[in-house]
Amino acid sequence: MDISISWVVIILLVLSYLILMEKWRAAKLPKNLPPGPPKLPVIGHLHLLGGGLPQHVLRGITQKYGPVAHVQLGEVSSVVLSSTEAARQAMKVLDPAFADRFVNIGSRIMWYDSEDIIFSRYNDHWRQIRKICVSELLSPKNVKSFGYIRQDEMARLIRLFESSEGAAINVSEEISKTVCTIVSRVAFGSVVKDQSLLLNLVKESLRMASGFELADLFPSSWLLNLLCFNKYRLWGMRRRLDNFLDGFLEEHRVKKSGEYGGEDIIDVLYRMQKDSQMKVPITNNGIKGFIYDVFSAGTDTSAATILWALSELMRNPEKMAKAQAEVREILKGKTNVDMAEVHELKYLRSVVKEALRLHPPFPIIPRLCIQESEVTGYTIPANTRILINVWSIGRDPLYWNEPDTFNPDRYDEVPRDIIGNDFELIPFGSGRRICPGLHFGLANIEVPLAQLLYHFDWKLPQGMTAADIDMTEKPGLSGPRKNPLILVPTIHNPTS
């Protein structure tokens, strides 16, 4: 009995301490903080996140409390931005104050202590690696030079689909493999031997790293940090990733040049590593972190967008017919298809825009406010986590007519770009932290999609209708389809 009473006293003392800390933190917050839902003691609004995907839940909050809303997730103060104007102020007007990135357990472990570019803090390391990326690695000129790789791999995929004509195929699996091979050849100069292992590592780590860990939301609690079992699983995956990358990088170092000749991304990074003029030394972990960025952001997101575009076209046969008519008219008789040819495909590019609007590769863009700022009249304290709900902005009825409807024709009336200038459509972000692989990613989406629409007519498996296509999203950083897309290809005969 005495032991039971002692435990009750301890629990009450701990709860009292947490409630007092909560009141102390609340007293320090500015009076003009954005509005938000009523919160519970200790956990704040954490209980609200159990009702669906984060982008959906946060949209529900901002629809009720306004496009700029405050959410308290445990000890962590966060502000959700779900309007074009709020995003414009944070990513353009006040860009330096919102250019930092907060780091959680998953990103710290899998992305090499933020020595990569995606999760790097806003510092000299980030400025240097971004400059290298934009000028040396993924510039439009370099992306264009990778065209022969895209052509090779699409020719292989087309042969595979031709050999399976009339049969139901897991299109999701084959497109993921193809995009992974393209990225592999660009990054490593050759095809990765254990490509399926790397692809599975990327997908699983993205899934695990995208979740909320209690230890992240209660950073002062050593106990929650100790009991964060997902952290130990992530470290296990990190060791597997290290073994894989260390072995491949050593092979690459010995081989000196890629399988296909020329200088690949690793060659450039090794060259920069030896450059004594570098302000911040490039470490081996930095190289591995960047390579992991290329695979995690370049493979999963590009494949997911192609699959969402195909899914939407299959649900809208008239849009599919229009896209195929354009592709087959403009590409007729052309043996090599890459960025120059795709640039002529106005409607196909609108299809991609619309797929990115409805299914952005990163539904929520995380930022960190590093100095007290004012957004749409509300005060955002320093060290507040910012969650820019790109998914919600792309479905805002103030800017989009019938926002939940797939309609590529809408861009004929109001052209919008996707390179960060039009804040109604920011699938790759904007400002200093805009995705540096934007051009590489678009090439790996538009070129394969054009080829698939040119060479094949697509049908659903027997017994399925357009209404049966499952459009459910899966949790993850890239917002992929929950279930694979199964389609039946029929070879298109231009002479028939």
Swiss-Prot record:
Report the Pfam families cross-referenced here. Answer: p450
- pH dependence (record): Optimum pH is 6.8-7.
Regions crossing the membrane: 1-21
One GO cellular-component annotation of the UniProt record comes to: membrane
Its keywords, alphabetically, are: Heme, Iron, Membrane, Metal-binding, Monooxygenase, Oxidoreductase, Signal-anchor, Transmembrane, Transmembrane helix
This protein's cofactor list reads:
heme
The induction field says: Induced by jasmonic acid (MeJA), salicylic acid (SA) and UV-C irradiation. Accumulates upon root colonization by Myrmica ants (Myrmica sabuleti and Myrmica scabrinodis) concomitantly with jasmonates induction; this leads to the production of carvacrol, an attractant for the phytophagous-predaceous butterfly Maculinea arion, whose larvae initially feed on Origanum vulgare flowerheads before switching to parasitize Myrmica ant colonies for their main period of growth. Slightly repressed by Spodoptera littoralis, a herbivory insect.
- Expression sites by tissue: Expressed in flowers, leaves and stems, especially in glandular trichomes.
MF (Gene Ontology): heme binding; iron ion binding; monooxygenase activity; oxidoreductase activity, acting on paired donors, with incorporation or reduction of molecular oxygen
Predominant place of localization: membrane
Please write the reaction equations for the catalytic activity of this protein.
Answer: (4S)-limonene + reduced [NADPH--hemoprotein reductase] + O2 = (1S,5R)-carveol + oxidized [NADPH--hemoprotein reductase] + H2O + H(+); gamma-terpinene + 2 reduced [NADPH--hemoprotein reductase] + 2 O2 = carvacrol + 2 oxidized [NADPH--hemoprotein reductase] + 3 H2O + 2 H(+); gamma-terpinene + 2 reduced [NADPH--hemoprotein reductase] + 2 O2 = thymol + 2 oxidized [NADPH--hemoprotein reductase] + 3 H2O + 2 H(+); (4R)-limonene + reduced [NADPH--hemoprotein reductase] + O2 = (1R,6S)-isopiperitenol + oxidized [NADPH--hemoprotein reductase] + H2O + H(+)
Annotated Gene3D superfamilies? Cytochrome P450 (1.10.630.10)
Q: What is the protein's membrane topology class?
A: Single-pass type II membrane protein
Q: Where does the source fall among the domains of life? A: Eukaryota
Its annotated compartments are: Membrane
Pathway listed for it is: Secondary metabolite biosynthesis; terpenoid biosynthesis
InterPro entries, A to Z: CYP450_71D (IPR052306), Cyt_P450 (IPR001128), Cyt_P450_CS (IPR017972), Cyt_P450_E_grp-I (IPR002401), Cyt_P450_sf (IPR036396)
Q: What are its E.C. numbers?
A: 1.14.14.-, 1.14.14.51
Which residues does the annotation say bind heme? 435
Q: How is it used?
A: The monoterpenic phenol thymol is widely used as a fragrance and a flavoring ingredient in food and cosmetic industries. Its derivatives have also several biological and pharmacological properties such as antimicrobial, antioxidant, anticarcinogenesis, anti-inflammatory and antispasmodic activities. Medical applications include the treatment of disorders affecting the respiratory, nervous, and cardiovascular systems. It may also act as a growth enhancer and immunomodulator. The monoterpenic phenol carvacrol is commonly used as a fragrance and a food flavoring ingredient and preservative. Its derivatives exhibit also various biological and pharmacological properties including antioxidant, antibacterial, antifungal, insecticid, nematicid, anticancer, anti-inflammatory, hepatoprotective, spasmolytic, and vasorelaxant. Phytochemical inhibitor targeting the main SARS-CoV-2 viral protease (Mpro) and ACE2 in human host cells, carvacrol is a possible candidate for treating COVID-19.
What protein family does this chain belong to? Belongs to the cytochrome P450 family.
**What's this chain's function?**
Involved in the biosynthesis of phenolic monoterpenes natural products thymol and carvacrol which have a broad range of biological activities acting as antimicrobial compounds, insecticides, antioxidants and pharmaceutical agents. Catalyzes the C2- and C3-hydroxylation of gamma-terpinene to produce carvacrol and thymol, respectively. Also mediates the C6-hydroxylation of (4S)-limonene to form carveol and the C3-hydroxylation of (4R)-limonene to generate (+)-trans-isopiperitenol.
Q: What is this protein called?
A: Cytochrome P450 71D178
